[in-house]
């Protein structure tokens, strides 16, 4: 379990090192883009976690499926927010350093969610809630933009 928590911490440290060296650099649009992505990502995480917490209070048995709020557009909006945060950190850090290797950090975090966390939770939910299959057909696994586009062009 410690390794799971160490990996994201290592990536943060790795990604932020160049910023510490070059913080006196003048501002440009990528700094603001990175900062904006971080803020939006954090807000998505906070809002989706609050929505999930409220849903679990109403449905303590763990058998229901949340399909309201942000969860109406993404099956994992909290993870989407987390991934957006990491890409924001990359854009912010890249604007200070210009180091292409920093791209490894958000790619690693995205891969960790896409190939480990999300599949694990999807399998776990399907075991206890077979009706989740219908939700999977309607709502994209991660990207709310895809759900929105599908709905716009479907009807």
What is each of the regions a protein language model found here?
Residues 1-5:
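Alpha-helical membrane-spanning segments of integral membrane proteins, especially the hydrophobic core
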Residues 9-51, 56-155:
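Hydrophobic transmembrane alpha-helices
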